[in-house]
């Protein structure tokens, strides 16, 4: 069995947003042995969501900054809302990040859920799924053609520099809808968010009937507390809460249903994040047999 992939949600948003805290967390994650660090995406949070997303650093700019400060850590967005952006500009940004990071970009993409944000940006919410489907097709074609003159439906153009990572930045698909599973079968990696193992299992099995070699790496919130319980994250979704051995047991349940790793949110906006990531690395990861 390959080693579990261990990613960490980095604090690029929240009341405690601070550049040194963001960089320090990424460097600590790299030193502690995490495989990847992930920022979160929102561009313009409407007032009703400002309590969580009102203070957020743009994710792709953040990845470029973090790429210059780290050396080994893979860097990604969980998850990049492609339909809110110019699709070819996104390709240019991701391939440039691949170049700047020396091939360390791996990112999840999603159709998005915040309708008012789409309205603020003048983006098409109703057809966002169709937009993402088309972008995935274009991205796959572009990565195959690079370097050189690329042919798009709208014409021809150069998308340089050449790719560092063979095949281009690794694309995961985030979400929990049936459409998400169809997209994940194309890219090969599914990134569900806030699903308990028992709800994830049938969807995982369906995905692997479509593509047996698919990897599944969920985003899971895990909070250190004295007493074990079913917790909730900042948006009221499923989370794991308890002492280290309980968290390890709950995460092992994901492995038991077929997951290939996790991207963990260790309460990104609370004080002491670096202490928690070290505690996770030293007291939880060894129990997972990784």
Feature locations, PLM:
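Active-site-adjacent structural elements that line small-molecule/cofactor binding pockets in enzymes
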Residues: 1-290
């Amino acid at each position: 069995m390959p080693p579990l992939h261990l990613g960490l949600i980095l604090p690029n948003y929240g009341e405690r947003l601070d550049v040194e805290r963001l960089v320090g967390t990424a460097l600590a994650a790299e030193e502690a042995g995490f495989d990847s660090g992930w920022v979160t995406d929102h561009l313009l949070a409407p007032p009703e969501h400002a309590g969580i997303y009102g203070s957020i650093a743009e994710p792709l700019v953040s990845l470029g900054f973090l790429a210059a400060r780290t050396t080994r850590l893979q860097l990604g967005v969980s998850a990049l809302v492609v339909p809110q952006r110019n699709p070819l500009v996104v390709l240019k940004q991701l391939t440039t990040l691949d170049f700047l990071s020396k091939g360390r970009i791996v990112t999840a993409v999603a159709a998005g859920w915040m309708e008012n944000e789409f309205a603020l940006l003048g983006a098409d919410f109703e057809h966002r799924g169709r937009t993402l489907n088309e972008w995935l097709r274009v991205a796959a074609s572009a990565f195959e053609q690079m370097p050189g003159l690329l042919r798009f439906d709208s014409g021809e153009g150069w998308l340089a520099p050449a790719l560092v990572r063979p095949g281009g930045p690794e694309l995961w698909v985030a979400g929990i809808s049936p459409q998400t599973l169809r997209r994940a079968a194309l890219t090969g990696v599914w990134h569900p968010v806030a699903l308990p193992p028992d709800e994830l299992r049938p969807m995982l099995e369906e995905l692997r009937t479509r593509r047996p070699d698919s990897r599944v790496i969920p985003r899971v919130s895990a909070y250190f507390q004295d007493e074990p319980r079913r917790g909730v994250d900042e948006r009221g979704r499923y989370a794991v809460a308890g002492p280290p051995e309980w968290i390890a047991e709950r995460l092992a349940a994901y492995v038991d249903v077929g997951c290939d790793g996790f991207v963990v949110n260790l309460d990104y906006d609370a004080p002491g994040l670096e202490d928690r990531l070290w505690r996770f690395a030293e007291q939880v990861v060894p129990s997972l047999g990784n």
